[in-house]
């Protein structure tokens, strides 16, 4: 279970990520030029795509889900499952340093927001109602992900 939800811990994690990998820092204008309007709204303004509308919701191919903004690996198809919530769901990130956790008190709720550790892009939220494997449900906007299919010899 994650316990990484305070701003102080998040700042420390960003510092740790900086030491281990290249953090992507861009101006607001650069993000606007790179991303579509919907990608910008979700990834940079913490928006949410409508449920059951995402292109990756029903994807069952084997591969890796990466950040739309910086292409950092975030989730594996091995961890994807159908939670019925209307957004792609995973029981864990691809590794412990792929995502950041941040308390989110918006809309009168207490949730835990997840962001890309490399570029600080909004991905979605994590909830403690996932499958028995981890008990967590990483609920992610499709628009915040790109899918890299693993080619098989089948």
Curated annotation (Swiss-Prot):
Which residues belong to any copy of the MsrB domain?
28-150
Reaction catalysed by this chain? Answer: L-methionyl-[protein] + [thioredoxin]-disulfide + H2O = L-methionyl-(R)-S-oxide-[protein] + [thioredoxin]-dithiol
Q: Which residues catalyse the reaction? A: 139 (nucleophile)
Q: What is its EC number?
A: 1.8.4.12
Per its UniProt entry, what is the enzyme's top EC class, as one word? oxidoreductase
The protein's UniProt keywords, in alphabetical order, are: Metal-binding, Oxidoreductase, Zinc
Biological process GO annotation list? protein repair; response to oxidative stress
Q: Mind listing the GO molecular function terms for this protein?
A: peptide-methionine (R)-S-oxide reductase activity; zinc ion binding
Q: Please report a single Pfam family linked to this protein.
A: SelR
Q: InterPro entries recorded for this chain?
A: Met_Sox_Rdtase_MsrB, Met_Sox_Rdtase_MsrB_dom, Mss4-like_sf
Q: Which PROSITE patterns match?
A: MSRB (PS51790)
Which protein family is it in?
Belongs to the MsrB Met sulfoxide reductase family.
Q: Name it.
A: Peptide methionine sulfoxide reductase MsrB
Q: Which organism is the protein's source?
A: Vibrio vulnificus (strain CMCP6)
Q: What is the lineage of its organism?
A: Bacteria, Pseudomonadati, Pseudomonadota, Gammaproteobacteria, Vibrionales
Q: Which gene encodes it?
A: msrB
